[in-house]
Design a protein with these regions (language model features):
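Basic, glycine/lysine-rich polyanion-binding surfaces/domains
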Residues: 2-169
């Protein structure tokens, strides 16, 4: 397993803040943060400041094309077509008999919907969805190798995002 440049930068940043890494027993070829060594400090950061959660082991599928929202509407349990630009929604992908294939969070921006799915399930979900793609003009792309993912929690999240990325949310 070879880490990308972005993974190395993220790992260095998190390690500098006390992250203890371990190889995941559940997610292949994945290093995850076990903890930062002080549960009380971690809890305090989430409640009073901000905390970064490394989530790169979660799956990320990008849906593009003029038919992708209609397709997702038919294949999942929530109202994807009413999802506004810049917003997100939780949904479930199920088989015809109701068996859950995966839980997902979908974010819509412009002509793309990003689908966050369970770790190690991107390929299975993409393959399953492809079986039901016939004449739809759309593309499903696995984005896991192209980017990293973090969550930022806590009341000072806006400040952290602005300071780190110069984005005002």
């Amino acid at each position: 397993y070879k880490m990308s440049k972005t993974q190395k930068i993220l790992q260095k940043l998190l390690s500098a803040n006390g992250a203890k890494w371990s190889k995941s027993e559940f997610f292949k070829d994945t290093q995850i943060v076990e903890d930062f060594g002080d549960t009380a400090r971690e809890t305090d950061a989430i409640l009073n400041s901000s905390a970064i959660l490394h989530c790169s082991h979660w799956g990320r599928l990008s849906f593009t094309g003029k038919d992708h929202q209609d397709f997702l509407q038919r294949m999942s349990t929530n109202d994807i077509e009413s999802l506004e630009n810049g917003r997100g929604i939780e949904s479930v992908f199920t088989e015809a008999k109701g068996r859950v294939i995966d839980l997902a969070t979908l974010y819509h921006k412009a002509e793309t919907t990003l689908c966050i799915v369970s770790p190690d399930s991107s390929k299975e979900l993409s393959d399953w969805l492809s079986k039901y793609t016939f004449s739809e003009e759309m593309t499903i792309t696995n984005k896991e190798a192209q980017n990293e993912m973090i969550e930022i929690w806590g009341p000072k999240t806006k400040h952290v995002i602005y300071s780190a990325f110069n984005i005002d949310i």
